[in-house]
Each structure stands twice: as structure tokens, then as C-alpha cells.
Amino acid sequence: MDLKQYVTTVENWPKEGITFRDITTIMDHGPAYKYATDQIVEYAKELGAEIVVGPEARGFIIGCPVAYALEIGFAPVRKPGKLPRKVISADYGLEYGKDTLTMHNDAIKPGQKVLICDDLLATGGTVEATVRLVEQLGGQVVGCAFLIELLELNGREKLGDLNIKTLIQY
């Protein structure tokens, strides 16, 4: 299935000069959403993933159905103040400043094989911070899966030799 046909391109959003790739039109189309999920599920099986981790909010949309299909857990990564128990945190750079991601300090067991899922690989900042959170807890990132990769932003460079799967590239 050609998933690109289900992505809506929105020019000049959220600001002038930005081309936004809207994945909600993949989610609107049940067979496309299922196909995308199934592709990532097969990848997760090949890697022997034991838990899925996803940054808010679209990482939940991608990662939760994968975890469900595999009958494994899902661990959310969130902005500060959104998780109720003790957390660990990792800062990451933005174009103008920095942001922070958090994760429950007991979300990953030492040695656990982790698949990170998100909607988009752009600069790699969010996923790189997510990798650091997993590694702080002793987890082993066996792969990262994304619906879309924006090649011109070189996000893979920030991720070193991590195993990466993307379903659509622009």
C-alpha cells in the first residue's frame, strides 16, 4: 500500500514557510492505519521488542496499537508535570531554546528491549532525548519506527547507528 496517498500536505502551517505532513488522514482511513501499524508490528517482532515507548502525543497514536498487537507494554514519554509518579528527565534542544521530556522511573526494566515509536523523524531531537531516558533506566533501544521521515532535516545523523524504520520519506 502506498501510504503517501493518505498523508495530507498543509502548506504554511503551523507558520509561514513550513510544509506540514498531516498523519490524521492515515488514521481516518482504517485500512491505511492498520497497514502502517502492521508494518511496524512486523519490524518490532524482528527486533524482539519487549516494550514500546512513545513520546506524546503522536507517539501514543503510533506506539499503542503496536504494543497492543504484540501483547507487550507501552511506556509514555511526556512533558514535565504530566506523569503522576517519580520521573526521570532529559532535556533536548529546539530551534529557539530547549524542552524537557520525562518518563516514570520504573517504566523500563534493566536490559529490556525497547522499540521507540513516533509519527515523524525530523531533526531527531525528541527521539534522541527519548533514547537517553530509556538508557538511563538500563533499557536497550533495539529500534525506532516512524510513519514519516523528513530527509532534508537529517534526523538520522543525531541517532547514530540506531536501527531505524520509516514507512514514508519526504
Swiss-Prot record:
Role played: Catalyzes a salvage reaction resulting in the formation of AMP, that is energically less costly than de novo synthesis.
Protein's pathway: Purine metabolism; AMP biosynthesis via salvage pathway; AMP from adenine: step 1/1
Protein name: Adenine phosphoribosyltransferase
Primary residence: cytoplasm
Subunit structure: Homodimer.
One Pfam family per UniProt: Pribosyltran
Alphabetized UniProt keyword annotations: Cytoplasm, Glycosyltransferase, Purine salvage, Transferase
Residue stretches in coiled coil: none
Gene Ontology cellular component annotations, sorted alphabetically: cytoplasm
PROSITE patterns named among the record's database cross-references: PUR_PYR_PR_TRANSFER
Listed GO biological process terms: adenine salvage; AMP salvage; purine ribonucleoside salvage
EC annotation from Swiss-Prot or TrEMBL: 2.4.2.7
GO function term, MF aspect, one: adenine phosphoribosyltransferase activity
InterPro entries, alphabetized: Ade_phspho_trans, PRibTrfase_dom, PRTase-like, UPRTase/APRTase
Subcellular location as annotated: Cytoplasm
Family the entry assigns: Belongs to the purine/pyrimidine phosphoribosyltransferase family.
Catalytic activity as recorded in UniProt: AMP + diphosphate = 5-phospho-alpha-D-ribose 1-diphosphate + adenine
